[in-house]
Amino acid sequence: MAIFKVEGGHRLHGSITPQGAKNEALQILCATLLTPERVTVHNIPRILDVMQLIELLRRMGVEVEQLAEDTYSFCAKEIDFEYLRTEDYRRRCTRLRGSVMLIGPMLARFGVGYIPKPGGDKIGRRRLDTHFIGFQKLGAKFNFDIADEFFMVEGKELKGTYMLLDEASVTGTANIVMAAVLAKGSTTIYNAACEPYLQQLCKMLNRMGARISGIASNLLTIEGVDSLGDTEHTLLPDMIEVGSFIGMAAMNQSELTVKNVSFENLGIIPAQFARMGIRFEQRDDDIYIPQQEHYSIDTFLDGSIMTIADAPWPGLTPVLLSIFLVVATQAKGAVLIHQKMFESRLFFVDKLIDMGAQIILCDPHRATVIGHDHRIRLRATRMTSPDIRAGVALLIAAMSAEGVSTIQNIDQIDRGYKDIDGRLNALGARITRIDDCE
């Protein structure tokens, strides 16, 4: 198992470009199953989760060709349904939560979809009810084999309908949209997720011949079509990487430029960093973060402690809360971090407390952080990455700490960040990757 050795106290300097968006990539790659025509996708991040999905598609029978370092073409003329019953298919799907989005395209085009209970980050319960209730409303029959933990959905002729989702699930909305584009008649989805990556999926499907309206709102209307054609698509930059790099610059008192961020698709993220007292400038489509010795957290108008909470888009994406939390440990002032959507994503704060951070874990959803204002440096320690984003938060803490920290289970970080050690070392960080470490 690989580990990181991180020597803290080295400031960053220079510029860095975010990779293509992982969460968009998972949706877009699954959507290639909707057509027998060739779909070319650019700006694909070469990270573990995405590469695993590409290999899974290849084993399912999709013709996959790498055209450039970050460009692949996909042609799903046929699917090997015998493979979907194999242990290899089960094993690969259970490692990747995004594999659940294979069901919608398979159901729409082939009338049946199989998937084992998917895996992914251990960050609490994440229900799949929204996906399957949506399929049932379109006329599909759902079955879950409890013994094998295997989902099967069948529906030879899906029919459009109205549905009000019980939660604005991003993957649930994507799955239902992909099923509905080939259904008969009109489908209306209310309380749909509307984040930029879902918008990108809908725009790509429209270029392929789908008829989706209401894009960027929480009310989508889909007029079913008989078939979809070929297209090319370019992924947006990953907003989570953008936020991570802003946090790194502030925490390490560094001057940094984040290039080609697609600022218009960052939503409330820049404003939330501004509430943390972090200064930055928008320069065309780049974000410049000047070196700051101190940053002060705002308070509410009545003087009460600032709260930063996640919410469905256009609210703050929950995957950045761990970054805000670790950045707050060296801010001036205090902040309440409220993680509403997952109940286990804040448990990594124990390691930050071991490093000397002042954090009160109020309950599984809330933590109060009292910043050191860079008067006291965090202490190096040994820690384990529990999931992708908490792993990067711990990496940020280690980069600013005094001494050499060890981070285990860095495969979790590799799932979401391409060559993160090499890219940060090029900016001045001191991160050593040690492979096959027991």
PLM region spans:
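Short, structured segments at the rim of ligand-binding sites
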Residues: 1-438
